[in-house]
Amino acid sequence: MQQQDSGGAIVNVSSVSGTRPSPGTAAYGAAKAGLDNLTASLAIEWAPKVRVNALDVGLVRTELSHLHYNADVVAKTVPLGRLAEPDEVGNCAVFLASPMASYVTGATLAVHGGGEVPAFLREES
């Protein structure tokens, strides 16, 4: 890391997959779990000059998301009833990088619409 007089803010983009297993995503989930731990560790090591935080992002509607899953079906499993929009994730990153979050470091902000509705509570279509 280059020496500097002032501090900075790092925002890592992680995933709910770091804490929520899913078939076929073991390597991805392990990498994201590692990123979550790296965030917490670097926040301690680099304080007080550098703040390090992460976003744990759930499903996001993108131009390619339809290739991976049916967004309307998946949205029914999210408490807010929809997938995130890219700008909603971006706004969270801007917040963590901004002076408004000047006392936030080592945090992981969940950007997942409330998580996942348990299967036994889902309404049948």
Residue locations for each model-derived region?
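A glycine/serine/threonine-rich, flexible loop-to-helix segment
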Residues: 57-78, 88, 118-125
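Short C-terminal tail/terminal secondary-structure segment
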Residues: 20, 94, 105-125
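Active-site loop-to-helix junction immediately N-terminal to the catalytic Tyr of the SDR YXXXK motif
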Residues: 21-29, 41, 122-123
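Alpha-helical segment proximal to the catalytic Tyr-Lys
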Residues: 3, 43-48, 102
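Residue(s) in the substrate-gating loop at a strand-loop-helix junction
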Residues: 15
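Active-site helix of classical SDR
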Residues: 6, 31
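Active-site loop immediately N-terminal to the catalytic Tyr-X3-Lys motif
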Residues: 20-26, 81, 99
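A conserved structural motif in NAD(P)-dependent oxidoreductases
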Residues: 78-89, 100
